[in-house]
Amino acid sequence: MTSSRLPVLLALVFSSLSPVLSHSNREMWFQDLFPPNTCPINAKTKTFYGIMFDAGSTGTRIHIYTFVQKSPEILPELEGEIFESVKPGLSAYADQPEKGAESVKRLLDMAIDAVPPHLWKKTPVVLKATAGLRLLSEEKAQALLSEVKEVFEESPFLVPEDSVSIMDGSYEGILAWITVNFLTGQLSGQNQHTVGTLDLGGASTQITFLPRFEETLKESPTDFLTSFEMFNSTYKLYTHSYLGFGLKAARLATLGALNTEVADRQMFRSSCLPKQLEAEWHFGGVKYRYGGNKEGETGFKPCYLEVLKVVKGKLHQPDEIRGSSFYAFSYYYDRAADTNLIDYEQGGVLEVRDFERKAKEVCDNMERFSSASPFLCMDLTYITALLKEGFGFRDNTLLQLTKKVNNIETSWTLGATFHLLQSLGITY
């Protein structure tokens, strides 16, 4: 569990959002994003909290945010964040929704300790599920969400009508982009040099950036673009979420097991795995048996050819990103840290080619890395192919890998929490 204290005037970003030009569904979403509130006269300093759950494919995470607003004329400050997570994700409980809800309750108990009792009834709690639940059938996903809703309703916190939901992947990208660029100071002042964001989850991956060239806007699919006003400027973002292209979904795709009815004792094999390996892996409530190619080749080259089939020609490649810089998090960060490309606590800056170099080292010497995840070669090779062949990044494209910016988690959850507080009229 971590806690941080940092005054951040994030509300300046979010309270000024308004739709200008957008894909139809997103236009409706942004219209409702932050309704105006009436500021009382002679109001005193107030402290308020927001509880946001991120129900991802590999784990469930709770973010407990503390805000302070000194007067109606001064925007709220982000005073601190408490963060914790549990594994596996809700989707692993697809056939046991009650157990999935129990994992949420364990995290919610932390909030009971963190939020003062006199503010419980004024503190909203919301869970937004991402790609893991999008991959489940509607019936199983709704069963999980219903159980979580019961846990919320039995708690002392404020439970909005839409307290549990499955969030569109593109909104993850939008909110994460706003959060990262605000926390890095890219949205203030006259000289704005925004950075793009790359998020690699277990089941999906997102890319979001601010196009600099009109050609990008003209050549991009219309549903990859969304616009809003902020700081008296209009931002037209390129953003898209690719379901099925997260790290763990890509493992299944490489093995030939994605969207496949798994037969009893069926074995999935890959040249990305150690030759003599035979093991079991549970993902999304399904058990998979996997192993290496005992008689075939192993190593980076045959592995890359396998992974290439998963990404080649499947993703849109805007030309201008080749010369842009991006913040990358989630599994980009984790795999880089696992292989000492970056410091686990501090993060670091890499070039795209650094992932390829490390993938070759791991894949061509699998025995040396046998104590690490058996999927390490496959994961690094997939990240390499995703960045180069999927998105079209150059070898020398710079990636800033980070878990936090100014001690705040790089996550869509902060933006979603402001949406929540504004929509409920909890801020002035």
Swiss-Prot record:
It is an enzyme of class 3 (hydrolase). It catalyses: a ribonucleoside 5'-diphosphate + H2O = a ribonucleoside 5'-phosphate + phosphate + H(+); GDP + H2O = GMP + phosphate + H(+); UDP + H2O = UMP + phosphate + H(+); IDP + H2O = IMP + phosphate + H(+). GO terms for molecular function: ADP phosphatase activity; CDP phosphatase activity; GDP phosphatase activity; IDP phosphatase activity; UDP phosphatase activity. Pfam families: GDA1_CD39. Its cofactor is Ca(2+); Mg(2+). Pathway: Protein modification; protein glycosylation. GO terms for cellular component: endoplasmic reticulum; extracellular region. Glycans are attached at N232. Keywords: Calcium, Disulfide bond, Endoplasmic reticulum, Glycoprotein, Hydrolase, Magnesium, Secreted, Signal. One of its GO terms (biological process) is UDP catabolic process. The active site is at E172. Its EC number is 3.6.1.6. Its main location: endoplasmic reticulum. Disulfide bonds join C272-C303, C363-C377. Residues 1-24 form the signal peptide. The keyword Coiled coil does not apply. Belongs to the GDA1/CD39 NTPase family. Monomer; active form. Homodimer; disulfide-linked. Homodimers are enzymatically inactive. Hydrolyzes nucleoside diphosphates with a preference for GDP, IDP and UDP compared to ADP and CDP. In the lumen of the endoplasmic reticulum, hydrolyzes UDP that acts as an end-product feedback inhibitor of the UDP-Glc:glycoprotein glucosyltransferases. UMP can be transported back by an UDP-sugar antiporter to the cytosol where it is consumed to regenerate UDP-glucose. Therefore, it positively regulates protein reglucosylation by clearing UDP from the ER lumen and by promoting the regeneration of UDP-glucose. This is Ectonucleoside triphosphate diphosphohydrolase 5. The lineage of its organism: Eukaryota, Metazoa, Chordata, Craniata, Vertebrata. The gene is ENTPD5.
